[in-house]
Amino acid sequence: GYQRGRYGAEDLRALDGWAAALGIELIPCIQTLGHLERFLHWESSAPLRDTPDVLLAGDEETYRLIEAMLRRCRACYRTKKIHLGMDEAMNLGLGGYLKKNGYHESFDIMLRHVERVGALARKHGFEPMMWSDMYFRCASPNDDYYEDDIEIPQTVIDAAPADMTLVYWDYYHDDEAFYDRYIRLHQKFAAPLRFAGGMWTWLGPAVDYDVFFKKAEPALRACLGNGVTDVMITTWGDDGGETSPQAMLLGLQAW
């Protein structure tokens, strides 16, 4: 944001070193498809733009950009893990891609993109993971992630690569049965599963702990009940990142 700093390569290497000294594995989380509106709104990025926030999949310039991201991450982090994002890429293939290539099913575009980006990540020594929602949205008539009666077609399950960990993110439900059902849906895929909850740090200067605990407790019970031991907590900084990291300590302990 405005007048906010950013970490350079030396800063990231220093953070990685301090984390390692404390027994913490620092893992980069980047975006390689959607959520790139702040980058894509510049005119210089126009050749890489499908829609205002989604990269132009299938274009070689896009993959040169992504490989540059991966090279930078490889130079700054000692971990083998990387999170490639790829969530909420709605309207994929309906902007610049449509003009350039004609109409293609968004799911087919995504599958080719996932395969290409995953190969690039592995080329640079990473074990990749991605958010899972786009696989669910393709099975939804409303392009939604969360639906009570959704069933994932076997063709979708079979098409997802087995060597790309799927991260089921859910910050919103307070019903253990819902988490239980969605974990079981994710477990139909061959890929390893990780769960990501949310600490509700994105509403202002304070963590909404009332909401957080109502969501976290049933989510973690469902994870334990279904053998999901790889879990993470997100602390997004939407709308200015006003929440102090010190205010998050209770949530980190609870998780």
Regions found by a protein language model. Name each.
Residues 18-43, 78-83:
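Glycine-rich, aromatic-flanked loop segments that form ligand/cofactor-binding clefts
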Residues 1-11, 34-37, 41-47, 194-196, ...:
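Aromatic-lined carbohydrate-binding/catalytic grooves of carbohydrate-active enzymes
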Residues 75-82, 86, 93:
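Active-site/ligand-binding-proximal alpha/beta "capping" segment
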Residues 14-17, 23, 63-75, 79-80, ...:
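Substrate-binding groove of N-acetylhexosamine-processing glycoside hydrolases
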Residues 2-11, 46-60, 96-108, 164-167:
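Glycine-rich tight-turn/loop motif centered on a GG-T
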Residues 30-36, 85-89, 134, 235-238:
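Short, solvent-exposed turn/loop segments enriched in Gly/Ser/Thr/Pro and often Arg
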Residues 37-41, 95, 141, 178-179:
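Short, solvent-exposed loop/turn and secondary-structure capping segments
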Residues 32, 36-60, 90, 150:
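Catalytic core of soluble alpha/beta enzymes
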